[in-house]
């Protein structure tokens, strides 16, 4: 399992794998977390990092009582598979 940190001051969730940083960017807007972009560099792709970033970000939003607006296509497809 990948360790994901919420970097609130940078408006994103981050994971560092083998020294390479992946992240999911978000914005807070009127009780909603707008998930805008997911970046997983090729050297760490295919390891489930994007899924862990998304799972953690969505769980955090739900714990805070916030709605999720999946503007990122990866987050949108992940939510369709994990309602």
Q: Could you say what each language-model-derived stretch is?
A:
Residues 7-13:
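A short helix-loop-beta-strand connector motif used in the catalytic cores of GNAT acetyltransferases and
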Residues 13, 18-33:
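A conserved beta-strand-loop-helix scaffold within acyl/acetyltransferase catalytic domains
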Residues 38-45:
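A short, internal acetyl-CoA/4′-phosphopantetheine-binding micro-motif in the GNAT/acyltransferase core
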Residues 46-59:
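Conserved acetyl-CoA-binding loop-helix of GNAT-fold acetyltransferases
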Residues 60-73:
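Conserved GNAT acetyl-CoA-binding A-motif
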Residues 77-83:
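Short, charged, intrinsically disordered terminal tails
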């Amino acid at each position: 399992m990948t360790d994901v940190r919420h970097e609130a001051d940078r408006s994103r969730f981050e994971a560092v794998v083998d020294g390479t940083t992946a992240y999911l960017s978000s914005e807070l807007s009127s009780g909603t977390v707008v998930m805008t972009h997911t970046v997983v560099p090729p050297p760490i792709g295919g390891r489930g990092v994007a899924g862990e970033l998304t799972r953690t970000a969505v769980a955090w939003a739900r714990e805070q009582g916030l709605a999720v607006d999946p503007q990122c296509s990866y987050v949108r497809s992940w939510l369709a598979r994990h309602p």
